[in-house]
């Protein structure tokens, strides 16, 4: 991994029991051709649009950056066991919270099994990063609202049905108030690791903003 201190200096192990932090995550990022329609909605409705790229979280929070040297070989091993699959992104749903609702695009419209299998395969190696025992629901957040039915219907009409190949997972982290930045991309089926010191897709915005 080319001498990068984030990743070098430790060999693989079966599991890594490190306490999670909200400053890191393992996620799937949709291909860039899907970003404009998603980001147009997020800029209107998502207060986290400057902090997060469009994403489906698989492990959040994840281990702190100082553990990446040990975490990356485990992610690579899990990714190597997980074949790529085609996801259908269709339908907009919402989670209700006390003060608002989170509206989200469903990336598992073709069935949750491949997502669940991928999340389980990765999560087995990080037992403290698997949440609190709740059911894993893959989702791509679009925004917050007091009127989720109206916004969900509007977003569904704007987005329609999209498909994308889930062929890699991305390791993200942030420093201070900076956005979440991809640090590595890990290919499903092979476990190949590509280090990414910076990754800013072209398009709307710059200077620390996601497109």
Name every feature range the model reports, one short phrase each:
Residues 2-211:
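Histidine-dependent nucleotide/RNA phosphoesterase domain, centered on the 2H-phosphoesterase fold
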């Amino acid at each position: 991994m080319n001498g990068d201190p984030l990743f070098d200096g430790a060999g693989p192990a079966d599991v890594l029991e490190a306490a999670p932090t909200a400053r890191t995550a393992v996620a799937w990022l949709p291909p860039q051709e899907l970003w404009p329609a998603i980001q147009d909605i997020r800029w209107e409705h998502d207060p986290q649009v400057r902090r997060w790229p469009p994403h489906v979280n698989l492990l959040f929070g994840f281990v702190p950056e100082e553990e990446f040297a040990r975490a990356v070989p485990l992610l690579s091993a899990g990714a190597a066991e997980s074949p790529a699959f085609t996801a259908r992104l269709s339908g907009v749903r919402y989670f209700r919270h006390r003060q608002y609702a989170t509206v989200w695009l469903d990336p598992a419209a073709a069935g949750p099994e491949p997502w669940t299998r991928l999340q389980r395969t990765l999560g087995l190696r990080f037992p403290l990063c698997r949440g609190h025992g709740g059911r894993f629901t893959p989702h791509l957040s679009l925004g917050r609202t007091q009127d989720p039915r109206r916004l969900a219907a509007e977003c569904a009409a704007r987005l329609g049905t999209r498909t994308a190949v889930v062929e890699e997972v991305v390791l993200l982290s942030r420093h201070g108030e900076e956005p979440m930045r991809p640090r590595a991309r890990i290919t499903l089926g092979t476990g190949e690791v590509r280090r990414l010191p910076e990754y800013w897709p072209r398009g709307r915005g710059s200077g620390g903003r996601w497109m």
